[in-house]
């Protein structure tokens, strides 16, 4: 009886909601890993775009309450259908293709991520956003010419230390979540490129 009573008290106290939310997330992560990572990516990507809009409003000292609702929706679509699933499978592939016991595994994984995955993923981001915004191929080409290299260089600066930690120290099942949390600010940066 005592353990059950103390458990009830613990759940009823401060922090019960975060504990239950975490337990639910871990359950969904175990039962539906790709769907859970997709949903998390969609939500956090949308939140990143919303954050970018709020930062932009503050920077311009705008007092209007209007926001571009389409921005967070586009980012949610991108996060749900692309970021979550692709990241899940990329990390899984990388873990099995370059196992920890391979010499210099951490460095090899980082190089694979930074030199192959990051440029391809960034190009995909520009392509999908161009499509979701209803723009044509010439707009995509202009975005690639004007925004790809600056964004990739910034990606390498910002994400290289984060990905080193993520790839080498974060458990495989949490890597997408770790990247999503860091990406809140990255998506805010990418969204600012679209202005």
UniProtKB/Swiss-Prot annotation:
The entry's localization annotation reads: Peroxisome membrane
Q: Name one Pfam family in it.
A: Mpv17_PMP22
Query: Topology with regard to the membrane?
Result: Multi-pass membrane protein
- Record topological domains on the Cytoplasmic side: 1-30, 97-114
Q: Where are the transmembrane segments?
A: 31-51, 76-96, 115-135, 174-194
- Read off the InterPro entries from this record: Mpv17_PMP22 (IPR007248)
Query: Which keywords are on file for this protein?
Result: Membrane, Peroxisome, Transmembrane, Transmembrane helix
Where is it mostly found?
A: membrane
| Gene Ontology cellular-component annotations | cytoplasm; cytosol; membrane; peroxisomal membrane; protein-containing complex
Q: Does the keyword Repeat apply?
A: no
Which residue intervals are topologically Peroxisomal? 52-75, 136-173
**Recorded family membership:** Belongs to the peroxisomal membrane protein PXMP2/4 family.
Complexes and interactors: Interacts with PEX19 and SIVA1.
Task of the protein: Seems to be involved in pore-forming activity and may contribute to the unspecific permeability of the peroxisomal membrane.
Q: Tell me which PANTHER family the record gives.
A: PEROXISOMAL MEMBRANE PROTEIN 2 (PTHR11266:SF80), PEROXISOMAL MEMBRANE PROTEIN 2, PXMP2 MPV17 (PTHR11266)
The protein's name in its UniProt record:
Peroxisomal membrane protein 2
Species this chain originates from: Homo sapiens (Human)
């Amino acid at each position: 009886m005592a353990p059950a009573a103390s458990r009830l008290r613990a759940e009823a106290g401060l922090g019960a909601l975060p504990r239950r939310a975490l337990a639910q997330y871990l359950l969904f992560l175990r039962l539906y890993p790709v769907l859970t990572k997709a949903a998390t990516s969609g939500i956090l990507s949308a939140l990143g775009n919303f954050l970018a809009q709020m930062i932009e409003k503050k920077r311009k000292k705008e007092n209007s309450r209007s926001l571009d609702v389409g921005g967070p929706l586009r980012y949610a679509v991108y996060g749900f259908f692309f970021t979550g699933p692709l990241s899940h499978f990329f990390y899984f592939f990388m873990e099995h293709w370059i196992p920890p016991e391979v010499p210099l595994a951490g460095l090899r994984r980082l190089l694979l991520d930074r030199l192959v995955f990051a440029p391809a993923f960034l190009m995909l981001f520009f392509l999908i956003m161009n499509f979701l915004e209803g723009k044509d191929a010439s707009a995509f080409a202009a975005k690639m010419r004007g925004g790809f290299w600056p964004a990739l260089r910034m990606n390498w600066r910002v994400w290289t230390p984060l990905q080193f930690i993520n790839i080498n120290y974060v458990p495989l099942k949490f890597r997408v979540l770790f990247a999503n949390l860091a990406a809140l600010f990255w998506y805010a940066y990418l969204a600012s490129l679209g202005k």
